[in-house]
Curated annotation (Swiss-Prot):
Residues noted as binding NAD(+) in the record, renumbered to the chain: 75-88, 288-300
Protein name in the entry: 3-isopropylmalate dehydrogenase
Underlying gene: leuB
Subcellular location: Cytoplasm
Organism per entry: Psychrobacter cryohalolentis (strain ATCC BAA-1226 / DSM 17306 / VKM B-2378 / K5)
InterPro entries given in the database record: IsoCit/isopropylmalate_DH_CS (IPR019818), IsoPropMal-DH-like_dom (IPR024084), Isopropylmalate_DH (IPR004429)
Domain of life, per lineage: Bacteria
Lineage, broadest ranks: Bacteria, Pseudomonadati, Pseudomonadota, Gammaproteobacteria, Moraxellales
Amino acid sequence: MATILTLAGDGIGPEIMTQAIDVLNAVNDKFALGLTLESGLIGGVAVDSTGEPLPEETLQRARAADAVLLGAVGGPKWDGIERSKRPERGLLKIRSELGLFANLRVAKLYPQLVNASSIKPEIISGLDLLIVRELTGGIYFGEPRGIRTLENGEQQGYNTMVYSTSEINRIGKVAFELAQTRAQAAGTAAKVCSIDKANVLEVTELWKQTMIELQQSEYSDVALSHMYADNACMQLIKDPKQFDVMVTGNLFGDILSDEAAMLTGSIGMLPSASLDEAGKGMYEPCHGSAPDIAGQDIANPLATILSVSMMLRYTFKQEAAAQAIEQAVSDVLDDGLRTVDILDRNEAGLIQVGCQQMGQAVLAKLI
């Protein structure tokens, strides 16, 4: 029997997690998956309860679990505390401690939401791209880092961006193999676009060269292209459907995946997976804790529900259950139900609903 650790976290985390758990329990019963759910603390609520953003008990339970489902962490309540104790440090630590090096973010536009995007329909209709982000290296984890006082009394902040060939090869393999899988399913040619700033950063010059060597030695059937990060930001808006799989480092991936989220109409629609080398993972929505709307029953639970779908697909290899959730989400959108973030007030026949009503509507499609 497999175990899933749920970590609701802060802000809207508990609201969206409640809906995701209901959906998970439904598919667990319907497909006889044999999954057991546990819960734990992370982020600000963990700081309030234990003094630590990632309590040792939570970390040990996460290590023992087969997968982790996360809501959201952080909020202004904890902005003034010591940096090492802030909620976001718990998220960084659990990723690092579990070896979750590969972050997968799917930017898929549901046809029902084409008018919710700020981009012209002809540019984004049919969008389905995957961003593979290296998650445990780069400038977010590089040492040395800190804030120091210079001899003249001025303060200076500094960080280090560093990648080894083994780290680059590891994330590259994930990207190339996912491109092969996606191409086989779609009946298209496999392609990967590697994002760097090799023109100014030596670390990404190594990134680019390592990707080239990996493709030539092991993945010659996958077309590999390269793009500077600043141009990639522009091209995502200009012509997003030119991409299938994008692979990049931690910092650029953080920026590009949030940009890609808005192509779909709302970051509230985007799930993500963070995987280790064995396929064990942590699954979470791409959005943050949104403390400004917490407790108001207006958050969009669909990204978290779709994160459950990704979990079933990538960790538990339950494709039928994963597709059932995705179809249920699509059916609810067909019914015209919209949370406020994806509501087009100029489109007739739409029904504004809250977090709970949206989640229960998806659940009803699965029962």
